[in-house]
Amino acid sequence: MGSHMTGENGQLALLDITVEFTGGLEMLFSNQRKHKISLPSLDITGAPSNIAYLIKYLCQNLMKDERKELFVLDDSVRPGILVLINDADWELEGEEQYRIQQNDNILFVSTLHGG
């Protein structure tokens, strides 16, 4: 394992990132739009953390609401949720396979509005 994956004491390195939710998604995350989190740099399989892992991590560790189906469908974000990585559409960045970098800003925007 390279030094960029572990800290000085051999612990798994953490990626400090900002995750934001808008368009109503914030209600699933304690009504808080912006969250600063420290994400493990490797997922449970030992692969570099990517957006797919972040989505699972958010559901398991940050989402307080039981209605996960409003955010995820089949282990991916629901259709109608835009994902921006450092202000760029995630489709330009490789979608779920994008490898998360230190200080990334990931924005989830719901385009679905109930009436």
From Swiss-Prot:
Main location: cytoplasm
GO biological process terms held by the UniProt record: protein urmylation; tRNA thio-modification; tRNA wobble uridine modification
Family that this chain belongs to: Belongs to the URM1 family.
Modified residues (1-thioglycine): 115
Compartment(s): Cytoplasm
Keywords in alphabetical order: Cytoplasm, Isopeptide bond, tRNA processing, Ubl conjugation pathway
One Pfam family from the record: Urm1
Top-rank lineage group of the source organism: Eukaryota
Pathway field: tRNA modification; 5-methoxycarbonylmethyl-2-thiouridine-tRNA biosynthesis
Organism from which the protein derives: Coccidioides immitis (strain RS)
Protein name: Ubiquitin-related modifier 1
Residues making up the signal peptide according to the UniProt record: none
Role this protein plays: Acts as a sulfur carrier required for 2-thiolation of mcm(5)S(2)U at tRNA wobble positions of cytosolic tRNA(Lys), tRNA(Glu) and tRNA(Gln). Serves as sulfur donor in tRNA 2-thiolation reaction by being thiocarboxylated (-COSH) at its C-terminus by the MOCS3 homolog UBA4. The sulfur is then transferred to tRNA to form 2-thiolation of mcm(5)S(2)U. Prior mcm(5) tRNA modification by the elongator complex is required for 2-thiolation. Also acts as a ubiquitin-like protein (UBL) that is covalently conjugated via an isopeptide bond to lysine residues of target proteins such as AHP1.
